[in-house]
Amino acid sequence: MSQPNPANTQEITQAATILSSVEKHLDRFVVGQGRLRETLALGLLTGGHLLLESVPGLAKTTAAAALAGAVGGEFARIQCTPDLLPSDIIGSQIYNSSTGRFEIQLGPVHANIVLLDEINRSSAKTQSAMLEAMQEKQTTIGGTRFDLPSPFLVMATQNPIEQEGTYQLPEAQLDRFMIKDVLDYPGPAEELEILRRLDAGVFDIDSPPEPACTLEDVRTLQRYARSIYIDPAISRYLVEIVSATRQASRYIGPLAQFIECGASPRASIAFTNASRALAMIRGRNYVIPVSYTHLTLPTKA
């Protein structure tokens, strides 16, 4: 899947400078969590949506808000509950008694970075309301289509399914996420650093730092990422990996019982986009096979 105009060295250098500035911005608010930071960068560069699973309190919300602040984007947080309605997410028509007309009130999904907190505590009907937004980057209210801003990134968090009050996400919803990542607790040294910064007032939000870049910078980075070169042989290797999940008994024998459903073509697209973004993060303008090894579990979880 070669590119006619692959990203050049100057573009990769420019990308590295911008990403370094974003990383420094995140570092003020998020201690450790290197895997989470990389996942955020992949989502930012590709526009692919992220599903993060962990127990509460591991900086998921903080990281999402910090990322929005780093790029100068609009941030919206939606707390998912069993009584949350689709209109609470996408918006609705409100009757204006003074004009005698219905007016459109856009919902919180019309932001650059949207956090769906504890998505698996909402009902399936509400979860499905996000499908059009996540895939088509648009919403429909009262028969009128509204385009979502660019860039647009959904970060959803979920608690482990065995916790009380959680619902299983349907396959159609899961398939919209580029990456699912499971976060772990910080180490003792990182937790001590959190307390040190707390005492020093580092986390105070009275004077938030200036954005590290602009939304136009993000759109430029996304364009650069799409032009990262992938050799046709590496693309074939990718397809073989994805195909193996559909013929699990042939490749992994007894372990096939743990695969409920093979990866869809959307997984191949996610693989391709994420591997290009990872190459850019690593300072390369081409993809190498080890990128797929690094991304296999998160993109197909």
Model-derived segments and spans:
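Walker A/P-loop
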Residues: 45-80
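Canonical AAA+ ATPase core
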Residues: 96-99, 134-213, 220-226, 276-278
